[in-house]
Curated annotation (Swiss-Prot):
Domain DPCK: 12-204
Cellular component GO terms held in the UniProt record: cytoplasm
Main location: cytoplasm
Lineage: Bacteria, Bacillati, Cyanobacteriota, Cyanophyceae, Synechococcales
Subcellular location: Cytoplasm
Catalytic activity: 3'-dephospho-CoA + ATP = ADP + CoA + H(+)
PROSITE patterns with a match to the protein in the record: DPCK
Pathway: Cofactor biosynthesis; coenzyme A biosynthesis; CoA from (R)-pantothenate: step 5/5
A matching Pfam family: CoaE
Gene3D superfamilies: P-loop containing nucleotide triphosphate hydrolases
Keyword Mitochondrion carried by entry: no
Name of the protein in question: Dephospho-CoA kinase
Length: 204
């Protein structure tokens, strides 16, 4: 059953999609061209794993030197590439990390939204909006859509992954076809950028 939405006076646009579907481009466009406050789940997730944080200590306790940044003593930083190699290849470990990080991210959103309560519209950029059950933070959900082949191409070009690695990372998220019926607006990012900009501008 779909999660209930936010029904307060503030309009909260949740921007989601698949990996490399173009969420960041849409979120930044809304922020820069329409002067809307932008809250980014990826930034909150990265902040959760800074050196010395409780989440970082939990990760280091679980994986030890396998994810410890070489050459650092105290506080120890996490080698994010090493951690990614673990969680993208093991569903159980990925679920463990998500259960650790998602509540931290949700709390950061709560604090930020309270600070922005006077703003009429806020944009929330949340890649795992449905997976993390965060759609209840949003009054509107916009899904940035493209084909799986385009996701692969963009991941390979952006992150230097192999085709197998790109497909593996895409498979860790809900497929876009599963997310489309849950969205209020599907933004087609399979063609020229100008197309989705026109689509957004017509409703903002």
């Amino acid at each position: 059953m779909p999660q209930a939405r936010w029904h307060g006076p503030q309009r909260r646009i949740g921007v989601t999609g698949g990996i490399a579907s173009g969420k960041s481009s849409v979120g930044l466009y809304l922020s820069e061209q329409h002067a809307l406050p932008l809250l980014d789940a990826d930034i909150y997730a990265r902040d959760a794993l800074v050196a010395g944080s409780a989440a970082t200590m939990a990760v280091l306790q679980r994986y030890g030197n396998a994810v410890a940044e070489a050459g650092q003593l105290n506080p120890i930083s996490i080698d994010r590439i090493a951690l990614a190699s673990i969680i993208f290849s093991d569903a159980q470990e990925r679920r463990w990390l998500e259960q650790l990080i998602h509540p931290i991210v949700a709390k950061r959103f709560d604090v930020a939204l309270a600070d922005l309560s006077a703003e009429p519209v806020v944009v929330l950029m949340i890649p795992l909006l449905f997976e993390a059950k965060l759609s209840g933070l949003c009054s509107d959900v916009w899904l940035v859509d493209c084909s799986p082949a385009q996701q692969c191409q963009r991941l390979i070009a952006r992150d230097g992954l192999t085709l197998k690695q790109a497909e593996q990372r895409i498979s860790t998220q809900w497929p876009l076809e599963q997310k489309r019926p849950l969205a209020d607006l599907v933004i087609d990012n399979s063609g020229a950028p100008r197309a989705w900009r026109d689509q957004i501008s017509s409703i903002c």
